[in-house]
């Protein structure tokens, strides 16, 4: 099997990618869609259904894309121009035209990384640096974590001495060093500058974090990091008869995820009488109408699946570092003066929402180390709010929503907010919400992946009992989660189960 380069694929499919009268495909997406075309062509060459006489006859009666007859083969220029070169013997180009129209309309191309699959299974590998000599040991901590600071004593004093962890009711000794793991920032070492007893009611991680921060702000506990004394370092690892003093070690592991192609399929049956009457009365073709219905429904369902998985895998907003003290976690309440920061009119309260969105976007960068959030999925009402407010540093003006498209009959892409966030409308939202996400400059830099395998397979037959025609479509694709997406889980084994969401 010959593997084509990116340039070769773009050159081969350029006429179809840039065909006059076809919906425009952004340059950044052309290489991906060219790969999808290549996978589709490979399926044409091996699958018999594309050469089935009845399917070819049905498609030939209504599709305007090129249908190549005899042994001519086909080329992208003919498909793009809608030119036929002979009697219909196979429908590959016709299906390719349908793929060309439908695939770029998937929302996955805008908010997911798109990685076309070459086979029904794919693999994602993640290399992780780990503290300790056994990278797969239970409780092994991941190093170089974007969310958690380094263990600043691991190569220093911490290698020679184990420090006690702070807990509820701990009584400190002046000058002693203690350790604590903050949920949001990781391991720290704290030296007691005064005698203090940790509050006995700090009996869970959140309360303990708050209590220790209070003592740090009071100056009772001071963050510290030190190397070991030379006299200690000289005796490390059994030197000169010393014992129980090994060097601290680090290692790495390579985790593998498997992504498997799954299928969607729909069929439609109709009577000969319906087809005849539809053609005679309305001048419509039953095959054409039903094929459009089936293909559109499959596309809408994939769009819904992608949005659902993004919302399901996202963290609850307005929590942790993005929660304003005194306000309710997970909810931005326009009736809460803390959330809207004492706004005097609606325009000011809308600007408070913009600030909350910025906080969520920055938190994505802190937790992933990749970049700030750059797209938003939101319900219609939220998009109307975003469209109605001035995003500049100015008076909080409020007016008609003229800046965005909020009509989902036209497009689910609303526009660009403040020059930095691409906004998409969830037209089927059950309640008002917004989700902030990040997709980087290339298709590998995303939190979730859409992996198309075979974009569209047409099927046609007749019911053996009543001889009425039946037609159907299949599509195969995978959905994968970035192995680094769950940033807060520092122990790698806890989040590497499978690349498939479940």
Curated annotation (Swiss-Prot):
Disulfide bonds: none annotated. Pfam families: Gp23. Keywords: Capsid protein, Late protein, Virion. It comes from the Viruses. The record marks 65-66 as: Cleavage. GO terms for cellular component: viral capsid. InterPro entries: CAPSID_Myoviridae, Gp23/Gp24_T4-like. A proteolytic cleavage by the prohead core protein protease gives rise to the mature major capsid protein during virus maturation. Belongs to the T4 phage capsid protein family. HAMAP family: CAPSID_H_T4 (MF_04117). Homohexamer. Interacts with the portal protein. Interacts with the capsid vertex protein that forms pentamers. Interacts with hoc; one hoc molecule associates with each capsid hexamer. Interacts with soc; this interaction reinforces the capsid structure. A total of 960 subunits of the major capsid protein forms the 160 hexamers. Major capsid protein that self-associates to form hexamers, building most of the capsid in association with pentons made of the capsid vertex protein and one dodecamer of the portal protein. The major capsid protein self-associates to form 160 hexamers, building most of the T=13 laevo capsid. Folding of major capsid protein requires the assistance of two chaperones, the host chaperone groL acting with the phage encoded gp23-specific chaperone, gp31. The capsid also contains two nonessential outer capsid proteins, Hoc and Soc, which decorate the capsid surface. This is Major capsid protein. It comes from Enterobacteria phage T6. The gene is 23.
